[in-house]
Amino acid sequence: MRKNLHSNIVKSIIGIALLAFLSSCNSDPLGTTEPPVDTNNPIEYSPGSADFSNYVAIGNSLTAGFVDGALYNLGQQKSIPALLAGQLRAAGGQAVFNQPSVNSDYGCSNPGSGCTLGKYKLDADIPGPSPTINGDPITAYAGDKSSLHNFGVPGIQVGQLLTPDTGTPGTAAFSPYYARFASSPGTSTILGDVISTDPSFFSLWIGNNDVLGYATSGATNEAIFTDPAA
């Protein structure tokens, strides 16, 4: 009796395991395959009450497309605003989303040292990521500055949106990433340039660098925060 019970339990376990194995052989067990597109009845998207005809983005590194420790072509092409603009296009967004291209496949990971090093890459032969050997200098944007839609500037804090010092070399707020596409370096501000485009819709990602700098300094320098009265 006990032997038969043991045999039945073993058979049940084997049966369940076999069933689970066969189920796992499903080429799409999570149902992630998208259903076929009905080309005869395309989906129509509506913007609702929003107007996406002139979408602009304001922010820091994530907005600019800064990845792998540098700003370079592929990162800009895959920036969050660029991806968002592509989706908004289906609901009346602009056909082209202009970004201040750096025209560099490697970017610059050490702007304070002459951009001798480019983006970081993962090398399994050494511990941690290493920069590519050659970086490219941060040069002025050669395109039409008045038609830009992405005003992301890597590393900036809230206050740097409001001051012309962000485009003025030698000042504490200076950023070469803004100076390169500023409408009037040393005079214009990021926010002023944004407003001049008369956006119909915008996204804003800013403020995390204010907190991050305070945290990474050991919470010892409250002056790093943007002045709330500014």
PLM segments and residue spans:
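Bacterial N-terminal signal peptides that target proteins for export
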Residues: 2-13
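Sec-dependent N-terminal signal peptides
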Residues: 12-20
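Catalytic nucleophile-elbow at a beta strand-turn-alpha helix junction centered on a G-D-S/GDSL motif
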Residues: 53-69
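Conserved SGNH/GDSL esterase-like catalytic core that processes O-acyl groups on lipids
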Residues: 71-229
